[in-house]
Amino acid sequence: YDPSPLQDFCVAD
């Protein structure tokens, strides 16, 4: 889980 603003759509888990 990486709460990155760039991958916020990908790390919703």
Curated annotation (Swiss-Prot):
Keywords from the named record: Apoplast, Cell wall, Cell wall biogenesis/degradation, Cytoplasm, Endoplasmic reticulum, Glycoprotein, Microsome, Secreted
GO BP terms, alphabetized: cell wall organization
Cellular localisation: Cytoplasm, Cytosol; Endoplasmic reticulum; Microsome; Secreted, Extracellular space, Apoplast
Main location: cytoplasm
Tissue: Roots and coleoptile. In roots, present in the mature region, but not in the tip. Not detected in leaves.
Inducers of expression: Increased by salt stress in roots and decreased by salt stress in coleoptile.
GO annotation, cellular component aspect: apoplast; cytosol; endoplasmic reticulum
Entry PTM: Glycosylated.
Entry keyword annotation includes Transport: no
Keyword field contains Glycoprotein: yes
Function: May play a role in altering the properties of cell walls during germinative growth.
Family as reported in the entry's similarity comment: Belongs to the germin family.
Assembly description: Oligomer (believed to be a pentamer but probably hexamer).
Protein's name according to its UniProt entry: Germin GS1
Species of the source: Hordeum vulgare
